Amino acid sequence: MRSRLAALLGLGALAGSVHADAVERLARTPEAFKAAVRASGPGDSVVLANGVWRDFEIVFTGEGTAAQPITLRAQTPGKVVISGKSNLRLAGRHLIVSGLTFKDGFSPSSEVIAFRQDAALAFDSRVTETVIDGFNKPGRAAEDYWIGLYGQNNRVDHNHLQGKLNSGVTLAVVLSSPESQQNHHRIDHNYFGPRPPLGSNGGETIRVGTSPFSRTRSLTVIEDNYFEGCSGEVEIVSNKSGGNIYRRNVFVRSQGALVLRHGEDNLVEDNVFLGGGLAGTGGVRVINARQTVRDNYFQGLRGDGFAAALALMNGVPNSPLNRYDQVLDARIENNIFVNVTAVVFGAGADQERTLPPARSRLSGNVFLGAGDKALFKAMAPIDGLTFTGNVVDGVAPLEGVAGFHASAIGRETLADGRVYPDAAARKTLGLKEPVKLLAREETGVAWYPKGDPTIAFERAAPARVTIPVGKLDLSEAGHAGAALEIVDQRK
């Protein structure tokens, strides 16, 4: 009996140790890759050989564990280029993808990287240190996502994404099934490089949810990302779900705003918005209920209206899902605004959007400018807003409204170029110490160069175009991202 029990225990130990020693399988062809994926279990790695993999539709599936994930990686990070008509789909649990470069091609499907394979989703999985550069469909109006996040508990981190020219969100969190809701995804330390103006909706860099699922909680964390020259449209980040956190992100010379478009109970904190004096650069736009915007820093933003440094929108009575819920119970606290163009209350007020912000509070914010310029714009009644402890210097207070105090504030310029109230002023005002500015080099990958958006992607000056009578042809009028000023000589 004892010998039989010992034999059974021995078999159990052997079964439990099948993948105790991780196996690396080097694949040099698509066929070898498929075989390697089929053979891999917890702890194993599938390694793509260095070189160009053209017209390669990658399907990476498996069931790893938290302690022993299954990994797909480049033999050498940056030396494996996925080109032509190619994409990547991953599905299963505890999968990791690392070190790939997508360039010189486009996806034949609706995503370049998808955390799903048909109906099968990815959970507890990660895409890291991967590059997508200019991987655009041939037609500008042809739509795709570069990364589609499905499932739950996935992470997208330390990736480099730049040069999207065609329609579609760069990174979309999709909530179209219960298995992808309340997902607890984490999106962090990514470099979102230049994206020129698309000229229409569909040019967001990040979108979390969509209108039909906007009452759903996503619970996604977007933190420590670097957005540079992300000017695809006025919504750089489009939040369309609830319970999300946007924290310690940096926006540099990006023409648009972080927009709480739909969804409730979202938090925007410790982010930095640096406009560099570029037209159209914005901060945060607030819509819906119970949004919190605190401890953020805004400097040199030249946007107005929907792209103001701060905009609280008017809402639509009995709003359908795809319009604008009223701003209710918002908390705008302890933010610092330096040399920005506009702060707008009741943005978008018109015959449809008739509900001004209500039951909302702006407290402890600091507004620094020069020459007592007019900064605040009330486009609708503001009696639903409470202002307490806000300080202005070099900015005209909101006329006839209590809760703004004009005071000379000592200033200092930090080593990173930000202008802050100095230490004495911070102590007097009860401000916390400046948050360390996330460095560009801390995001993305170390082995792929980051471009210069001020040269390649800065919005062009308007091109004057003459319209011949009866014909309009703009095909030769400008380059991608150009702003066109149309002159009709018939008038």
Predicted feature descriptions by range:
Residues 24-31, 45-56, 60-112, 132-136:
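Right-handed parallel beta-helix/beta-spiral solenoid domain characteristic of secreted/periplasmic
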Residues 54-59, 84-91, 103-127, 132-416, ...:
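Glycine- and acidic/polar-rich repeat regions and solenoidal domains
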